[in-house]
Design a protein with these regions (language model features):
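A short, well-ordered alpha-helix in the C-terminal region of glycosyltransferases
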Residues: 335-349
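Carbohydrate-associated surface elements
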Residues: 151, 171
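Conserved acidic donor-binding segment of nucleotide-sugar-dependent glycosyltransferases
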Residues: 309-320, 328-334
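Conserved donor-binding/catalytic core segment of Leloir-type glycosyltransferases
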Residues: 185-212, 227
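Short alpha-helical donor nucleotide-sugar binding micro-motif in glycosyltransferases
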Residues: 83, 256-257, 264-269
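Aromatic "clamp/platform" in nucleotide-sugar-dependent glycosyltransferases that forms part
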Residues: 277
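Short hydrophobic beta-strand element within catalytic cores of glycosyltransferases
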Residues: 294-297
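Nucleotide-activated donor-binding/catalytic signature segment of Leloir-type glycosyltransferases, i.e.
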Residues: 239-257
Length: 371
């Protein structure tokens, strides 16, 4: 099958959508499909060129703009001709995805079978998307809609008003994230909490530092430490919060790290924390769960796809409960051990084999809907 991946963001940029689209493309190629990526993100060849990256043809359709903005209203000129001969298009939508949206118009006018994956929780944008009516028309005219979690799919179902919206989750290489020799017992009296996120307001890194300060106050003997891995526009605000709370000796902000380093940091930690309320999926949390860490997050976020409360982590209704749950893990090593044992012996449902099969089913659904 010839599959066109259509996405605003792609490698070498690093983020949830970028990495997931690249990994899914590679897995599909390994199963015998032909995949090409169309994106606004520049690569080694710059803008307006085509390159082969990890065996996949990548068409770079962006233009050079200040602050590396990924906007090009002319990107879809000629796209229809480029998409001729493909069997299906797979559009990847984020909170703001002008290119992906333009691609929706192109593929619908072509009659090209199309599936659209929503990688975001619409939240306040739901009313605007509903009022525009475009997504509903796409779905009702045969575009196969899905989202990365049931949390992300729920507002989309209200918007499309009838056509089914399925779940196509993010995938993970379970073997790659499993510890090869079990988890080390550090035994130094320190409880290490870790999080990996973009330092953006939507991810709530400031609230995480504030919550952990309350955990330290509630469990002064636990030796609580916090490490937040990632970069973003909120770094300065997070650093000011650390200074205000006098937390420099127990909070570290190493920045963005590669996957191998992330695995090492998880191996040296005890608990993963995901404070975001608007988390559509939470791939970093899933990686930590596969690595054996108990995962603590908020009810109503995407991590509920792979975290069961009081089984392999905790799901809190609000920040006060989040503090209580984190405190429980800080002072009760037996609870941490129980959850870690479960996570190490129980594979999640989001392994790549299952996810690729689900993607293929979506492509078949799109082709059937297109007639």
């Amino acid at each position: 099958m010839r599959i066109a991946m259509l996405t605003d963001c792609y490698l070498p940029r690093l983020g949830g959508i970028e990495v997931q689209v690249a990994d899914l493309s590679a897995r599909l190629v390994a199963r015998g499909h032909e995949v090409e990526v169309f994106t606004l993100t520049p690569g080694a060849v710059g803008f307006g060129q085509t390159e082969t990256l990890d065996g996949i043809r990548v068409h770079r359709l962006g233009v050079r703009l200040p602050r590396q903005l990924l906007v090009n209203p002319l990107a879809t000129r000629g796209l229809r001709a480029q998409l001729e001969g493909f069997d299906v298009a797979h559009i990847h939508m984020g909170v703001v995805s002008p290119f992906a949206s333009d691609c929706g118009f192109v593929t619908s006018r072509m009659g090209l079978p199309t599936t659209m994956t929503w990688h975001c929780v619409l939240d306040k944008a739901e009313s605007a998307v509903r009022a525009a009516g475009i997504v509903r028309r796409w779905a009702q005219s045969g575009m196969a809609m899905n989202a990365v979690s049931d949390v992300a799919a729920t507002p989309l179902r209200r918007i499309v008003d009838g056509p089914p919206v399925t779940v196509l989750p993010n995938g993970i290489d379970v073997d790659a994230w499993r510890p090869t020799s079990g988890r080390p017992l550090l035994g130094d009296g320190v409880v290490r909490f870790v999080s990996a996120m973009r330092l953006e307001a939507r991810k709530r890194p400031v609230q995480l530092v504030e919550a952990m300060a309350k955990v330290r106050a509630a469990a002064p003997r636990a030796g609580v430490r916090l490490e937040i891995l990632g970069e973003g526009s909120e770094r300065a605000k997070v650093e000011r919060t650390v200074d205000r709370l006098g937390a420099k000796d127990w909070v570290s902000l190493p920045g963005r790290v590669p996957r191998d380093t992330l695995k090492e940091r998880y191996a040296a930690s005890d608990v993963f924390v995901s404070p975001s309320v608007l988390e559509s999926f939470g791939i970093a949390a899933l990686e930590a769960r596969v690595a054996g860490l108990p995962v603590v997050g908020r009810v109503g976020s995407g991590i509920s796809e792979f975290v069961t409360d009081d089984v392999n982590g905790f799901l809190a209704n609000d920040d006060e409960e989040l503090v209580r749950r984190l405190t429980t893990l800080a002072v009760h090593p037996s609870v941490r051990s129980r959850m870690t044992a479960y996570n190490l012996k129980t594979d999640p449902a989001q392994g790549w084999d299952q996810v690729v099969q689900a993607a293929e089913a979506e492509y078949a659904r799109a082709r059937a809907l297109a007639g």
